[in-house]
Amino acid sequence: MGTFVTPATDYAQFPKANIILITHEHKDHYDLEAITTLRNKATSIFVNNAVFNMFKNGIVMRNGDSIQYAPDIKIEAVPAYNYSEGHQQFHPKGRDNGYILTLDGLRIYIAGDTEDIPEMANLKDIDIAFLPCNQPYTMTVDQLVKAAKTFKPKVVFPYHYGETDIQQVVKLLDGSGIDVRIRDYQ
């Protein structure tokens, strides 16, 4: 028997996007129908090379690239990958992006699908971090906690956590000074 999945969002109810960031080509991150609904002629779509090869549209960003999109908006592509034995094929090193979006000084880290990679030690002054927690595709609870303690964002939103007991993140980061906010981002 298959599993019924309710569509996450009715994107037609949203305003058109100025910017769309796509981390990689997996269907839970690259949804052509959602993109088509949310974009207009002025929308800038930032993608990795694998998405560009499928979509034939967008601005390709590779790990380490940075774009000053507007005077108060900067977009940086950062690495997102799996390193654990047997998991590297899900998100190979060098292919996928996480993003740091700086909006008028507010720094938001969108990790994409990744584990607690060494490059996270280079993240500085992150105000809000969106961190995934769902092995084998992303981080374990312990990896997420280690990552958060490494670069110390002010706020962490765990996402992509499926059946993971995400309250463990709250418990393990209690007293760290990091505000953990749980939403229904399964």
Task: Give each language-model segment a name.
Residues P15-N18, K41, D125, K152:
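Alpha-helix C-terminal capping/helix-to-coil transition sites in glycosyltransferase folds
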Residues S84-K149:
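Active-site-proximal loop/helix segments of hydrolase catalytic cores
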Residues S66-E76, T102-I108:
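Beta-strand-turn-beta hairpins that frame and shape the catalytic cleft
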